[in-house]
Regions:
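Flexible, glycine/threonine-enriched loop-and-boundary segments that flank and lead into catalytic domains
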Residues: 2-6, 10, 14-39, 116, ...
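Long, cytosolic, alpha-helical-rich C-terminal regions that act as interaction/scaffolding modules
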Residues: 41, 50-196
Length: 196
């Protein structure tokens, strides 16, 4: 089942990349740096997710949404306000919630959620429980991280869109998510034009 899912994701990613490359080649057929080019970028993402049971997939989707929210916040509020100040434009400060702290919870090195997860994947005897214990030990004081009291595999994150509870069951296996050597050889040997 994991091999099937990994293969599906790799094929989807390759097909998606091929589609974007082909569209861009049609929009800008001349490889010329003399003028502005026409390109298209496609963002394929789910919206913010909060289900009764949330796992690694929802964590990744919600992290991507946190990044999009920060991009919006940075452009609309932070950048515009700096420009107004630089140009001495009279304006009224608009209060906004900055989600950088939540992004830091995910991205900080070495004690961000993803960094801890990557380190734990490399540990031969790591389990979902040892991962959860490391999250609690290293992230427990972060205001955006809330360890569950009664269930050791669960924690919550205070996102910009609300608090979401996650279950670490399967985090390690899903993060490994690599194609086996046999599947890679099968794809490479297929000779199909859509396969890398």
């Amino acid at each position: 089942e994991n091999a099937r899912d990994s293969l599906s994701m790799a094929l989807y990613s390759a097909l998606f990349g091929l589609l974007v490359d082909r569209i861009n080649a049609c929009l800008n057929p001349v490889d010329d740096d003399s003028g502005p080019s026409t390109r298209i970028s496609i963002l394929d993402i789910f919206g913010f997710e909060r289900f009764e049971s949330n796992s690694f997939e929802q964590l990744c989707i919600n992290f991507a949404n946190e990044q999009l929210q920060q991009l919006f916040t940075r452009h609309l509020f932070k950048q515009e306000q700096r420009e107004y100040e630089a140009e001495n434009i009279d304006w009224r400060s608009i209060p906004f919630e900055d989600n950088q702290g939540c992004l830091d919870l995910f991205q900080s090195v070495p004690h961000g959620l993803f960094s801890i997860l990557e380190d734990e994947v490399a540990v031969p005897r790591a389990t979902d429980l040892t991962l959860s214990d490391k999250f609690r030990a290293l992230l427990g004081t972060n205001p955006h991280f809330c360890p569950a009291r009664r269930t050791p595999l669960q924690f919550s994150i205070r996102h910009y869109a609300g608090t979401v509870g996650y279950d670490t069951a399967g985090f390690l296996e899903k993060n490994r998510d690599s194609l086996s050597a046999g599947l890679e050889a099968l794809i490479e040997g297929s000779g199909h034009c859509l396969l890398p």
